[in-house]
Amino acid sequence: NYRSWRMAEIVRLCEQMGVPKPIVCQPYYNAMNRMPEVEVLPACQHYGLGVVPYSPLARGVLTGKYDPKVKPGKGTRAGRGDQRIMETEFRKESLIMAQKIKVHAEKRGMSAGVFATLWVLNNKIVTSVLAGPRTVAHWNGYLEALDYEFSPEDEALIDKLVAMGHPSTPGYSDPQ
């Protein structure tokens, strides 16, 4: 989780010291958080770093399991009051967006989670995703994304919901 200027400085210092530079960057990147597209992903491409984003499902929000009109279930991160999700992804705008993605994905015959993973993997700069399944079913959902092709209509949907380089909520900044 480094800003692009820090990545450049790390690469410069590694070259100066004659040691291997980093080989991968793990940004927080998904369809609700497109901020890395502005500087981080281009820096990775420039310096030849692999990109393995974490939280492609936005801590589960992009699965569409949270209805913005319904209190989250007790067995969910939001239902347990998990601080990370409550301070980040669990915002009305994101929940509404996730429901729109869910409807679109289901029309294509896939789950919203598969769609969200596929969206991240569709970025040519991305090497892989850092998956965090809690169950075998979750793991299979990540793998299922490899069975689909991303369409121009899919990309247009995400571009309509979240502008390139921005988060799902205008002016939002992840409190890392």
Tell me the role of every PLM-derived stretch.
Residues N1, Q26, A116, L130-A131:
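Short beta-strand segments
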Residues N1-M35, E39, G50:
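Glycine/proline-rich, positively charged
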Residues R3, Y29-N33, S55-L62, W119, ...:
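Glycine-rich beta-alpha junction loops
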Residues C14-K21, K107-G109, E149-F150:
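Short helix-capping segments at alpha-helix termini
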Residues C25, C44, V51-Y54, I101, ...:
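Conserved, mostly hydrophobic/aromatic
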Residues P36-T76, S111:
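Aromatic-lined glycan-binding groove of carbohydrate-active enzymes
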Residues H46, K74-V103, K107, N122-T127, ...:
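Terminal-tail/helix-coil boundary detector
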